[in-house]
Amino acid sequence: AYYAEKIPQYDEDIRAGRRKLISYKEIRKAIFEVVEKYEIKVVCAHNSRFDVNAVNITQRYLTKSKYRYFLPYGLEVWDTMKMAQSVIFKQKRYKEFCKENGYMTKNNQCRKTAEILYRYISGNNEFIESHTGLEDVMIEKEILAYCFRQHKAMEKVLYPAPLPKPIEEEDIYCFEDYLKYL
């Protein structure tokens, strides 16, 4: 899954027009626009702590820590790994599936990767996760849907949305200032 191993594939996809290379600034701007346009209140990923940390660290690096957070303020972050912990990992059938297929950790715990969860819920034990963005999102949405179909109480939230922050005039200027860094 290491990124450097994917570079030839990304290069080919960019040349073929299947992917577009854009700046970090453009990515963040697009996310803000989509969140606002569709009034999105929640984002979700498998092991979302990794993703949130990665984008925040990149944000801090690029702006020399002047701007610390990548996602829009007030957006709640859900984690399908937490959800699966509540509703899938407790299933006797999932535990048997992991044991039968050698999907156990050295501490004899069932592994919790999106790839293994997708193998379990899809019945496709040959599935290999591509770790290339959109393709991964497509399996993570299946994990999310599967968790909701269980109709059980589950922990979802990585970070609850904070109370709405009043918009100050200085915030508008800060965002314009931020754009200079990218």
Question: What does each model-identified segment do?
Answer:
Residues 35, 55, 59, 84, ...:
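Hydrophobic residues within well-ordered, non-membrane alpha-helices that form the packing/core
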Residues 50-78:
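Substrate-recognition/cap helix-loop segment adjacent to the acidic, metal-dependent catalytic center
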Residues 29, 53, 78-81, 138-141:
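Non-catalytic, well-ordered alpha-helical scaffold segments
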Residues 1-58, 115:
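Conserved non-catalytic scaffold segment of RNase H-like nuclease domains
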Residues 19-23, 27, 42, 69-76, ...:
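Glycine-rich, flexible loop segments associated with nucleotide phosphate handling
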